[in-house]
Amino acid sequence: MAVISMKQLLEAGVHFGHQTRRWNPKMAKYIFTERNGIHVIDLQQTVKLADQAYEFIRDAAANDAVILFVGTKKQAAEAVKDEAIRAGQYFINHRWLGGTLTNWGTIQKRIARLKEINRMEEDGTFEVLPKKEVALLNKQRARLEKFLGGIADMPRIPDVMFVVDPHKEQIAVKEAKKLGIPVVAMVDTNTDPDDIDVIIPANDDAIRAVKLITAKMADAIIEGNQGEDSVAAVEAELAAEPASTESIEELVEVVEGK
């Protein structure tokens, strides 16, 4: 049984790509058709490839992999944070700082500073410092927390990276490739898929689409860590849905109200 049904993908708008003039020709094999100047993603492939991504992430988690969720645009930020936390993993959902992976030593020093400021508040140091200095420390902490809070407890560079919109997160993807870190990603029709190891063809601009795919990757981690019982409720929900016999053409027409 597919981990994500065609019905779920359609309802979340996963099939809507970019305007045809903005496409990347390397995504041609994942495009089903064009409607009103918009490319429509082949959801039959998305169903199959989402299964492969789920299995990849699940197996990595079963081997105690450190998995980093990356999505810094506004449509992705909330889901990336929430699902990474739910799965007990790590995230970056604001601007990617160049060198986050390739200059991990420097990043660790900044994380150490963040933790030091937190300790200063906890042990009462703030109470004996001038208010102006405390204000500066709080400002510094807020900035560090914004960019590094999601990886503050990450024990090492990640073993796998899940990315929403690798076109936007090109720096993150390049750093991962340089270090040999496999990348699983939601790949829209405007993106070069060549640097992505495990591709999920999908609309990466709709909040519902991002939430759906990101949540499934979190489910994969939970299953890998704890066994199938932890996602039994999700599977039961899918099993309750009637099997669809519609073709993708018919589904697209239904969505467009034809």
Swiss-Prot record:
Look up the domain of life of the source: Bacteria
Could you tell me which SUPFAM superfamilies the record lists for this protein? Ribosomal protein S2 (SSF52313)
A single MF term (Gene Ontology): structural constituent of ribosome
Q: Name one GO biological process term.
A: translation
> Per UniProt, which keywords does this protein have?
Ribonucleoprotein, Ribosomal protein
Pfam families, per this entry? Ribosomal_S2
In the UniProt record, the signal sequence range is: none
- A cellular-component GO term for this protein: cytosolic small ribosomal subunit
Protein name (Swiss-Prot/TrEMBL)? Small ribosomal subunit protein uS2
Give the source species. Answer: Streptococcus suis (strain 98HAH33)
Organism lineage = Bacteria, Bacillati, Bacillota, Bacilli, Lactobacillales
Gene it is expressed from: rpsB
